């Protein structure tokens, strides 16, 4: 499999450090509010990458953190008159409700920054001892210029970064580009004891510590949104590699931005959507499918019209699968069309896998999936039970990689007995060639909200949606 590595700006063949095992770290949310659709993109994209690795037989150690102490959290907690810990607990639970509905598999471990303070202090002390960090009035800063490779992820030199960066020009710093590893206690903020006085960790040190603690000093893949490349991921590399002398991550993967109606999503523009808002109105898998119909590195434009289109597309997959389940019950043992459908499915599955192997190209892969749905819909009525079962299994297999077709239940909605009795009466009328009566019953069923479909395998009844 080839993956685009931000560090080298090329697609590279992925080989894990340890055979059969992939170690991934994905930057998780700051839990001060409900996650928005911009947060949902890395969740869905890198969950899909994990699913594909697992499909290929790898064991995936997947770490996704929660940032549960940070300026936004402190401000909101103080505003609501609760502790940062209470705020974090509330929104971590809300996060899981949304992520579960999006079929995002739970991480192997989801460490919280506040539970790893001791290890953060130890790493900061190590950087001080090696001359990479210094203490000023209870704050600890990283000496950015001392790390010779600073800028290698964002592919900029120090001067370029100085010119374009949003840096804190504190008079305490030796250099404006130096960043905080530890922040001295301020009024109204949570604080922990340290060798430099009470305070709290900086954002960047949190991820370095959690990644190395649970995955080792060099990991296979570090991933997140492209907005994290600088300064967050650049700073993670600097402090981690300064401390260990080893490469921090072999592959750096970044997803593109989500825009709303071709504008950058922001609360101030009033074009801000939470995941909860969308999945309460639309099928959660429609949001997932929508995200995967674009290449993960490209910007993604979100609109209600596009999510509605994704929901219609998702319905086509569910309808195809449901139809296969129905046809299998009464299908013939063999058919002359079997080879044609099997060959089409095998070819499209191979193309799907090739697309996934090429830098997780879910945009192409979903295209092949819908071609497969069209082939199945065209030929299914005249295929054998064995071929229909084969089609159903492959459809389910590929959808599972994408994390869709997982909220399906064939008996999701039982057909009332009186409706089934009317269907049987209509069947008897058709057998007796009493087509006027059959049509009358069909119209009666329609008025009751049901449609009947006559197929070679029998009569199918569905609620009109």
From Swiss-Prot:
Short sequence motif 'HIGH' region: positions: 29-39
Keywords carried by this UniProt record: Aminoacyl-tRNA synthetase, ATP-binding, Cytoplasm, Ligase, Metal-binding, Nucleotide-binding, Protein biosynthesis, Zinc
GO CC, one annotated term: cytosol
Cofactor(s), names only, from the UniProt record: Zn(2+)
Enzyme type, top EC level: ligase
Pfam annotation, one family: DALR_2
Cell compartment(s), UniProt: Cytoplasm
SMART domains assigned: DALR_2 (SM00840)
EC number: 6.1.1.16
Coiled-coil spans in chain: none
HAMAP family hit by this protein: Cys_tRNA_synth
Name this protein carries in UniProt: Cysteine--tRNA ligase
């Amino acid at each position: 499999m080839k993956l685009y590595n931000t560090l080298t700006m090329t697609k590279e063949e992925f080989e894990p450090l340890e055979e059969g095992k992939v170690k991934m770290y994905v930057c998780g949310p700051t839990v001060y509010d409900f996650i928005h659709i911009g947060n949902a993109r890395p969740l869905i994209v890198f969950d899909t990458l994990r699913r594909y690795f697992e499909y290929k037989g790898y064991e995936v150690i997947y770490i996704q953190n929660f940032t549960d102490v940070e300026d936004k959290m402190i401000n909101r907690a103080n505003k609501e008159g609760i502790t940062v810990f209470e705020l974090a607990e509330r929104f971590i639970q809300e996060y899981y409700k949304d992520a579960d509905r999006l079929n995002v598999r739970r991480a192997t471990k989801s460490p919280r920054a506040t539970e790893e303070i001791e290890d953060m202090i130890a790493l900061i002390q190590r950087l001080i001892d090696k001359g990479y960090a210094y203490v000023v009035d209870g704050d600890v800063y990283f000496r950015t210029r001392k790390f010779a490779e600073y800028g290698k992820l964002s592919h900029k030199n120090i001067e370029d970064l100085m010119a374009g960066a949003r840096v804190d020009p504190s008079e305490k710093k030796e250099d404006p580009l130096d960043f905080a590893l530890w922040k001295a206690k301020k009024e109204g903020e949570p604080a922990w004891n340290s060798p430099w006085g009470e305070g709290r960790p900086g954002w960047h040190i949190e991820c370095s510590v959690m990644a190395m603690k649970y995955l080792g000093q060099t990991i296979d893949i570090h991933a997140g949104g492209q907005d994290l490349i600088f300064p967050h991921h650049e700073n993670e590399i600097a402090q981690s590699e300064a401390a260990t002398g080893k490469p921090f991550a072999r592959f750096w993967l970044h997803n593109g931005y989500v825009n709303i109606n071709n504008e950058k999503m922001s609360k101030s523009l009033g074009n801000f959507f939470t995941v909860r808002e969308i999945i309460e109105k639309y099928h959660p898998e429609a949001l997932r499918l929508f995200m995967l119909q674009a290449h993960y590195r490209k910007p993604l434009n979100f609109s209600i019209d596009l999510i509605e289109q994704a929901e219609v597309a998702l319905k086509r997959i569910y309808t195809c699968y449901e139809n296969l389940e129905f046809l299998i019950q009464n299908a013939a043992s063999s058919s002359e069309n079997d080879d044609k459908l099997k060959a089409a499915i095998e070819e499209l599955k191979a193309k799907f896998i090739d697309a996934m192997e090429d830098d997780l190209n879910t945009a192409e892969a979903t295209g092949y999936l819908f071609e497969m749905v069209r082939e199945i819909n065209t030929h299914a009525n005249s295929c054998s039970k064995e071929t229909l079962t084969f089609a159903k299994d492959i459809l389910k297999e590929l959808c599972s990689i994408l994390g869709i077709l997982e909220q399906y239940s064939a008996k999701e909605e039982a057909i009332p007995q009186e409706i089934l009795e009317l269907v049987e009466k209509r069947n008897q009328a058709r057998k007796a060639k009493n087509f006027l009566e059959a049509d009358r019953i069909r119209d009666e069923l329609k008025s009751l909200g049901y449609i009947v479909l006559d197929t070679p395998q029998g009569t199918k009844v569905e609620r009109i949606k």
